[in-house]
Regions:
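STAS-typified acidic loop motif
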Residues: 3-33
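A charged, well-structured terminal subsegment
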Residues: 102-124
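Long, contiguous secondary-structure blocks with strong helical propensity
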Residues: 12-13, 77-78, 114-118
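Amphipathic alpha-helical interaction surfaces in cytosolic regulatory modules
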Residues: 22-100
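Residues that form or immediately flank small-molecule/cofactor binding pockets and catalytic motifs
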Residues: 12, 85, 107
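General small-molecule cofactor/ligand-binding pocket signal
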Residues: 6, 81, 103
């Protein structure tokens, strides 16, 4: 299944829905470009909903780690949520569950950001 994503933007948060298989940098180019564009526009809080992500390999994980590093270097945060069981097992095996901020749901991810920023991140 080909990788794709959609994004919903609020004033202070970019909410990404990832779908398909994230296996190579080429398929993630649009994601990286979109992310960097948001970051350059001053958006520093991101939620990546992985609910529809079918598969990710080490290259795909590397893409996510690169995005996480960029946002943290900018003083922000990237939270992943709705992680499928197989992908969660991969995060546990690689110990990336200690690197990424992982939430059970999109609402939980937004609440984490609200606590960090003391702001009114929209639930829409």
């Amino acid at each position: 299944m080909e990788f794709s994503f959609s994004v919903e933007q609020t004033e202070s948060l970019s909410d990404y829905q990832l779908s398909g298989n994230l296996m190579d940098k080429e398929s993630a180019n649009d994601l990286v470009n979109s992310f960097e564009e948001k970051l350059n526009d001053g958006i520093i809080y991101f939620v990546f909903n992985l609910e529809k992500l079918s598969y990710i390999n080490s290259t795909g994980l590397n893409v996510l780690i690169g995005l996480l590093t960029k946002v943290r270097n900018s003083g922000g945060e990237l939270i992943i949520c709705n992680v499928p069981k197989k992908i969660n097992q991969l995060l546990l095996i690689t110990k990336l569950n200690t690197v990424f901020n992982v939430a059970m749901s999109t609402n939980e991810a937004k609440n984490i950001i609200k606590k960090e920023t003391n702001s009114n991140v929209s639930d829409n």
